[in-house]
From Swiss-Prot:
Cofactor requirement: Mg(2+)
Function: Necessary for normal cell division and for the maintenance of normal septation.
InterPro entries per UniProt: G_ENGB_dom (IPR030393), GTP-bd (IPR006073), GTP-bd_ribosome_bio_YsxC (IPR019987), P-loop_NTPase (IPR027417)
Organism: Rhizobium etli (strain CIAT 652)
PANTHER family: ENGB-TYPE G DOMAIN-CONTAINING PROTEIN, MSS1/TRME-RELATED GTP-BINDING PROTEIN
Record family assignment: Belongs to the TRAFAC class TrmE-Era-EngA-EngB-Septin-like GTPase superfamily. EngB GTPase family.
Gene Ontology CC: one annotated term: cytosol
Alphabetized GO MF terms: GTP binding; metal ion binding
Protein name according to UniProt: Probable GTP-binding protein EngB
Keywords linked to the UniProt accession: Cell cycle, Cell division, GTP-binding, Magnesium, Metal-binding, Nucleotide-binding, Septation
Cross-referenced PROSITE patterns: G_ENGB
Gene name in the database record: engB
């Protein structure tokens, strides 16, 4: 099968680098999508479920563990010349950890804002919202930051297996209504469960469409 026809989520992904500051960013090339969310929103678990690899993104019970931009790409590309992966997933540091020192929070904010504002290959940020708690104040702050940076973002509800199934459509509608007037928000809200696998194909398809890849299965 030609490289361009490889299914996006049908073969292994690998971690390629952690980025503690902008000087460590890989050269701009393939399209990128980033995942953002509060500490312990289930970000690493969702990325692992998305690509079907339990140990790809590190999961931790310690909030605020991820302090770098972590890059993941489909395996099988050398990265040399034109042999580049079709896209990259960027796992952003979790925010909103109450015990994080102010210096750490300030560093996170600067790294993230500089990345968001200056990365031409970034096509969309998926902002994860815990379905049990809804949009919190620190989520609102991040959405405002994304609006100011003029970066397209889409909200994704996580852990929907933790709430009653009939409540999910109502929560989706309420969440969509809350972001309706935000200039950079994509209007459709997605719902997922890493535990049960619910909504993962919808998210895979959304990512593939965002980066312009037809063959994602």
């Amino acid at each position: 099968m030609p490289e361009t026809e490889k299914p996006l989520f049908g073969h292994p992904w690998i971690f390629i680098r952690g980025v503690p500051s902008l000087t460590f960013l890989p050269p701009e090339g393939p399209s990128e999508v980033a995942f953002a969310g509060r500490s312990n929103v289930g970000k690493s678990s969702l990325i692992n479920a998305l690509v079907g690899q339990k140990g790809l993104a590190r999961t931790s019970n310690t909030p605020g563990r991820t302090q770098e931009l972590n890059y993941f790409v489909p395996d099988g590309y050398s990265g040399e010349g034109g042999d580049l992966p079709p896209m990259a997933i960027v796992d952003m540091p979790g925010y909103g950890y109450a015990q994080a020192p102010k210096e750490q929070v300030d560093k996170w904010t600067k790294l993230v804002f500089d990345y968001l504002r200056g990365r031409a290959t970034l096509k969309r940020v998926y902002v994860l919202i815990d379905s049990r708690h809804g949009i919190k104040k620190n989520d609102e702050d991040v959405l405002t930051l994304l609006d100011k940076a003029a970066v397209s973002y889409q909200l994704v509800l996580t852990k929907t297996d933790k709430i009653k199934a009939p409540a999910v459509p109502k929560l989706l509608a309420e969440t969509a209504d809350k972001i309706r007037k935000r200039p950079a928000a994509y209007p459709a809200v997605l719902s997922t469960s890493s535990e049960k696998g619910d909504g993962l194909d919808d998210l895979r398809q959304a990512i593939a469409q965002t980066v312009g890849i037809a063959n994602w299965e």
